[in-house]
């Protein structure tokens, strides 16, 4: 959703201005993303904290002048706030970016028009590179006739997902670990 908690600090997207904020215990909310200004408005959701790299990773919608909308998975540096570094783009929609427990891999769901997320989505994974970007992307599951939902990493690095590939929603596991 639009809120996550890491070591007592709350990270949330504020409805009134759609900015991403950090609220430390006993503190006041601090904005991590820019205020709307030049006509581009950013909206943030579905994120989590990458503690090793001091950043929040989640979905960003950029609403630009002329009605254009660009969706991406971004990383927002919590020490040097800004609109976020794009990690993944190129699809119409993104959801559920999930960092592996060891912080070495990122999984996410994407899909394109005319599909809706319950019709056809794809699950992707990539290693996180030394510079914090993503390495080679691998499609793990999904397509135009398969919907993937709720990717989740187990503590030992196994990726679980829900798929309707056989006409019914079922749980699947994928071993995508790297050496």
Segments and roles (model prediction):
Residues 9-32, 44-50, 56:
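Hydrophobic or amphipathic alpha-helical targeting/insertion segments
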Residues 24-27, 77-81, 128-132, 175-178:
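Short loop/turn segments that connect beta-strands within beta-propeller blades
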Residues 32, 79-89, 132-143, 179:
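Blade-edge beta-strand/turn elements of extracellular beta-propeller
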Residues 1, 12-21, 36-43, 59-73, ...:
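A flexible loop/linker signature enriched in serine peptidases of the S9 family
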Residues 9, 54-56, 105, 158-159:
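Conserved core beta-strand positions within WD40 beta-propeller blades
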Residues 5-7, 49-52, 101-102, 154-156:
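Residue-level detector of Asp-centered blade-edge/turn motifs that repeat once per structural unit
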